[in-house]
């Protein structure tokens, strides 16, 4: 059982260190997302491909947020 706890502690420490690096580099990845990315890479996903997907999802998220804000602004001006 100690071995399992040691492995969990080591994994948590690794995530903490990678989260610190992520924060310094302004990657905006929380610990949970970072853990998922690490797991995907450990299971064979290409880090470069994963980075591309994360960038694309962020871009789409920003575009969707902008469209929602624009639609809300247009609806607000029509009510006046």
Curated annotation (Swiss-Prot):
Q: Which domain of life is it from?
A: Eukaryota
Residues of the signal sequence?
Answer: none
Q: Subunit notes for this chain?
A: Part of the gamma-tubulin complex.
Localisation: Cytoplasm, Cytoskeleton, Microtubule organizing center, Spindle pole body
What does it do? Required for gamma-tubulin complex recruitment to the microtubule organizing center (MTOC).
User: Which keywords, in A-to-Z order, does the entry hold?
Assistant: Cytoplasm, Cytoskeleton
What are the BP-aspect GO terms? gamma-tubulin complex localization; microtubule nucleation by interphase microtubule organizing center; mitotic spindle assembly
Q: What is this protein called?
A: Mitotic-spindle organizing protein 1
The record's family statement is: Belongs to the MOZART1 family.
Q: What is its main location?
A: cytoplasm
**Spans through the membrane:** none
User: One GO cellular component from the entry?
Assistant: gamma-tubulin ring complex
């Amino acid at each position: 059982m100690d071995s399992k706890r040691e492995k969990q502690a080591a994994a948590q420490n690794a995530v903490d260190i990678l989260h610190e690096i992520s924060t310094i580099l302004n990657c905006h990845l929380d610990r949970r997302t970072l853990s998922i990315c690490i797991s995907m890479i450990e299971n064979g996903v290409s880090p470069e491909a994963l980075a591309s997907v994360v960038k694309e999802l962020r871009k789409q998220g920003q575009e969707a947020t902008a469209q929602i804000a624009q639609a809300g602004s247009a609806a607000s001006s029509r009510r006046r």
